[in-house]
Amino acid sequence: MNSPIDKLERKLGYQFKDAGLINLALTHRSANSKHNERLEFLGDSILSFVIADDLYHRFPKVNEGDMSRMRATLVRGHTLAELGREFDLGDYLKLGPGELKSGGFRRDSILADAVEAIIGAIYLDSDIEKVRSIVLSWYNSRLEAIKPGVSQKDPKTRLQEFLQGRRKPLPVYTVTNIKGEAHNQEFTVECEVAGVDKPVIGKGTSRRKAEQAAAETALEQLTNG
């Protein structure tokens, strides 16, 4: 009889030799004193390397700035959370009662962190070449679609250029809340933008990420509204 983890492994395209690693990768700090943050730290570095290496060889004539922007697009929390949802990762996460109640299994930051932790776990369970092949299989369609150029500018830059092009004042970002312990904080930022009726809210694990999230939402409202 197949276990839930067997089903997840099929979605990931990798079967763990050490089941303890995948279980640890799925354990949020709210659920246990042994949690996935160290694996997340490892996976973050591995992901950045694998994507940078692929972009370097895929785009031999593209400069460092464009490669950095493409990598940032591919490894940002929103993209990782999309991957997590493709794997139905929220169904497998181990969360504490508070996070369960607040819908943590749907939260971008928790899904993104778990994807990075799984990458770290696969590396420890195998080797760098295996984890490279797995990560590239997950990213295949995104790597095929990505192109250097303006679309890779971060949301804050794109919002600023959008407003400047229309002779509008620049956005104002204000941190309205910081919660959590120093190593596991969530920032809430309000972004006031000309042309948007009320401040746009963004959340993230750093001030910068929260500002980028707010800018992305503001751009969507300005261009779709």
Swiss-Prot record:
Alphabetically ordered keywords of this record: Cytoplasm, Endonuclease, Hydrolase, Magnesium, Metal-binding, mRNA processing, Nuclease, RNA-binding, rRNA processing, rRNA-binding, tRNA processing
Domain DRBM positions: 154-224
Record bears the keyword tRNA processing: yes
Coiled coil: none
Top-level taxon in the UniProt lineage: Bacteria
UniProt region (Disordered), positions on chain: 204-225
Major localization class: cytoplasm
Record-linked PROSITE patterns: DS_RBD, RNASE_3_1, RNASE_3_2
Cofactor or coenzyme needed: Mg(2+)
Localization in the cell: Cytoplasm
InterPro entries: dsRBD_dom, RNase_III, RNase_III_dom, RNase_III_sf
Chain sites annotated for binding Mg(2+): E40, D113, E116
Active site (record annotation): D44, E116
Reactions performed catalytically: Endonucleolytic cleavage to 5'-phosphomonoester
Entry's Gene Ontology BP terms: mRNA processing; regulation of gene expression; rRNA processing; tRNA processing
Biased composition (Low complexity): 212-225
Task of the protein: Digests double-stranded RNA. Involved in the processing of primary rRNA transcript to yield the immediate precursors to the large and small rRNAs (23S and 16S). Processes some mRNAs, and tRNAs when they are encoded in the rRNA operon. Processes pre-crRNA and tracrRNA of type II CRISPR loci if present in the organism.
Family the UniProt entry places it in: Belongs to the ribonuclease III family.
Subunit structure and binding partners: Homodimer.
Name recorded for this polypeptide: Ribonuclease 3
Source organism of this protein record: Vibrio parahaemolyticus serotype O3:K6 (strain RIMD 2210633)
